[in-house]
């Protein structure tokens, strides 16, 4: 493992990198007094303490010399020094890292997980070493299937595991990969037999190789190892991602550490399996089990930086229109600033979600109606106490009322002429008499009465005009196209100006 100045916090090499990990399931070979038996941190007077529960602390430190130093830390009350742990000893923990570069993991070199898996299954590395020695003497041409038979024994189990992950393959076998230097362990590699052909597994596609690599790591983890998987979703279809996470959850041995930017992983995992790491933070935030509903309905929330929690589909659509308007004016959008819309689907979940997400380290605000404020007053107060900005309609108003009573008369006429294109249902019906009344309206009082009449029709239960995302987008476009005509002191206009600024976009 190599380091550079870029690995240090703010590239300050005067502050060393220090990482400590507490490990259990310690390989038996490391528990002798000659090794690290005296460094176990458990209470050794406890007769009930089993070997699998014994724990040690391994510390990695890197100073300005950029040389990594690995030690096992001494017990706090002991008089012994920290002890260096070698790469060979660390390898016994079977920690492996899965990335996009997996080709070398299908060869039997000593640093590959396939080598570790075979050695673990056979209980000995001699069969592999024996083949290497023979190859050095006679080269690859002298090796036939009989020579590889013993290495093929563990591959039946590996085939079962990889098929559980959703990969359909032929028979697996160990063969000579003629690409590699025949004098190295890389020339003995995993192959697949199909249609009378035998091809090195490294020639498979990215997704297939990744699944095979994960299957090998899973088998190793079953012996108490640790697997690190970066961006698990890379090269995999959504159904396979879900299958992988489900199988990981069933594992009762070993450990799997996964990083992801996939909503499919968030959906399939359980809340207590999820930890959030925010940029600039030095600790992880564990997702609360109470967040299950939010996790299932808004998995995208966990990948944002700034979250707008809104009440329902109308608000979501309205914010989408705001995002499109921002893109036209600033050549940037919500994604540029890491802004994500979260639909709480009404009730006090708006404020519950907002507070929980705030506690996970996200920057959060609320954009919602204010027509049932008495019922939600305690939740609102809790959100304010958590320093969450609330961009709410005037007291007693839903978003539709706030808009209909705020826009200019010309914009109002455009609103009632909505053609409902793309709407999931079409509920806008105006009688000829009402259309004439609207056309003939002159006084402010007449126009106000008409606005209130249209509002009641627009929010009528089970016949709502805009209670869906396309409806919200339409309302958003009406408001934003009429923005300059709305008075500066209007609550809707004030909220939109503040919300844009909160998102990171200046005032027009």
Where on the chain are the PLM-derived regions?
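Switch/communication elements of ASCE P-loop NTPase nucleotide-binding domains
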Residues: 1, 183-301, 491-495, 501-508
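Conserved P-loop NTP-binding catalytic core
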Residues: 1-50
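Conserved catalytic network of the ASCE P-loop NTPase/AAA+ motor domain
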Residues: 10-15, 48-51, 62-64, 88-91, ...
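A sensor for short, sequence-defined functional sites
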Residues: 36-124
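Coupling/switch segment of ABC-type P-loop NTPase heads
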Residues: 83-156, 403-410, 417-419
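Hydrophobic positions in the central parallel beta-sheet of the AAA+
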Residues: 96, 227-229, 308
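Extended helical coiled-coil dimerization/tether regions that scaffold
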Residues: 119-211, 216-226
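Acidic, Mg2+-coordinating catalytic modules of nucleic-acid enzymes
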Residues: 302, 306-308, 316-508
